A protein has these predicted regions:
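Negatively charged, low-complexity tracts enriched in Asp/Glu with abundant Ser/Thr
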Residues: 1-13
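Intrinsically disordered, low-complexity segments enriched in small/polar residues
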Residues: 1-2, 18, 51, 64
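Small/flexible residues
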Residues: 4-7, 32, 45
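Assembly/interface hotspot detector across virion components, adhesins/toxins, and nucleic-acid enzymes
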Residues: 5-7, 20-22, 58
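Short linear sequence motifs
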Residues: 10-13, 46, 59, 63
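Short, flexible N-terminal segments of the mature chain
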Residues: 11-38
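Short interaction-prone segments
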Residues: 34-57
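Short, compact, well-ordered microdomains
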Residues: 51-73
Length: 73
C-alpha cells in the first residue's frame, strides 16, 4: 500500500488534510479528510475518483497515520 497526503486551508477551521490509501499502482482505495483544529474526520471508503490527480503535489504519508485516523470516530 502507498499513502499520500495534502493540505489546504478551510476558512474558520484551519488546515484540512486529505489522506489517500492507494494500491501499488496508485489506484485510490480509500480517502479521508482530517481537520486537526476541530477534530473532524470524514471517511470515504469507496471514493468516486480512483486515480490520483497530480500525485507530484502530494506528500508521502505513513500507514499508521491513515489507519489511526480511519479508526477514530
Amino acid at each position: 500500500m502507498l499513502y499520500f497526503k495534502c493540505a489546504q486551508p478551510v476558512p474558520g477551521k484551519g488546515e484540512a488534510w486529505t489522506l489517500y490509501e492507494c494500491g501499488d499502482d496508485q489506484t485510490v482505495l480509500r480517502t479521508l479528510t482530517h481537520i486537526p483544529v476541530t477534530g473532524e474526520v470524514t471517511r470515504v471508503p469507496d471514493p468516486i475518483v480512483k486515480k490520483l490527480y497530480r500525485p507530484e503535489m502530494l506528500q508521502p504519508a505513513e500507514a499508521e497515520e491513515f489507519t489511526a485516523l480511519w479508526g477514530e470516530g
